[in-house]
Amino acid sequence: MYPAHLLVLLAVCVSLLGASAIPPLPLNLVQFTYLIQCANKGSRASYHYADYGCYCGAGGSGTPVDELDRCCKIHDDCYGEAEKMGCYPKLTMYNYYCGTEGPYCNTKTDCQRYVCACDLQAAKCFARSPYNNKNYNIDTSKRCK
């Protein structure tokens, strides 16, 4: 084997070792997105909820800024309860449908049922809560204490 081939092989092995430390992406985020779209009948894109208030998006702290932000806090708390049950809510895939009355869950395992219920509750809460553009992309270091 040529020295150049060995260097390439070594580089591939090292990169694979580094990749094993990268945490998996949330798999059910796509499902949650579809539940949101179904619940609000496509009136607002789901990405609008990814950086809203103190709780919609990654993390969360302080007092929710409004009703919609409270939906996100409740969703975060629901995922926390799922984790206490031994579930992995961000990785749990579940079956759901978008019917004429809105989204509903159709799952088999306890974790799937619980996580889908968390997402369904949040999606319906988003649909009935007013969206205040002033609470999108806020400075959380100042407003979320």
Curated annotation (Swiss-Prot):
CDD domains xref list = PLA2c
* Cofactor binding remark: Binds 1 Ca(2+) ion.
List this protein's GO terms for biological process. arachidonate secretion; lipid catabolic process; phospholipid metabolic process
Q: InterPro entries from the xrefs?
A: PLipase_A2 (IPR001211), PLipase_A2_Asp_AS (IPR033112), PLipase_A2_dom (IPR016090), PLipase_A2_dom_sf (IPR036444), PLipase_A2_His_AS (IPR033113)
> What tissues is it present in?
Expressed by the venom gland.
Residues cleaved off as propeptide? 22-27
Q: State the top-level EC class.
A: hydrolase
**Active site residues of this protein:** H75, D119
The chemistry this enzyme catalyses reads: a 1,2-diacyl-sn-glycero-3-phosphocholine + H2O = a 1-acyl-sn-glycero-3-phosphocholine + a fatty acid + H(+)
* Disulphide-bridged cysteine pairs: C38-C98, C54-C144, C56-C72, C71-C125, C78-C118, C87-C111, C105-C116
**Alphabetized GO MF terms:** calcium ion binding; calcium-dependent phospholipase A2 activity; phospholipid binding
Q: Which Gene3D superfamilies match?
A: Phospholipase A2 domain
The EC number(s) this enzyme carries? 3.1.1.4
- Kindly give the SUPFAM superfamilies that the UniProt entry links to this protein: Phospholipase A2, PLA2
> What are the record's GO terms for cellular component?
extracellular region
Residues that bind Ca(2+), according to the entry? Y55, G57, G59, D76
Compartments, as annotated in UniProt: Secreted
Q: Which residues form the signal peptide?
A: 1-21
Question: Which key words are in the record?
Answer: Calcium, Disulfide bond, Hydrolase, Lipid degradation, Lipid metabolism, Metal-binding, Secreted, Signal
What cofactor does this one take? Answer: Ca(2+)
Q: What does this protein do?
A: PLA2 catalyzes the calcium-dependent hydrolysis of the 2-acyl groups in 3-sn-phosphoglycerides.
Stated family: Belongs to the phospholipase A2 family. Group I subfamily. D49 sub-subfamily.
Q: What is this protein called?
A: Basic phospholipase A2 cPt10
Tell me the organism. Answer: Laticauda semifasciata (Black-banded sea krait)
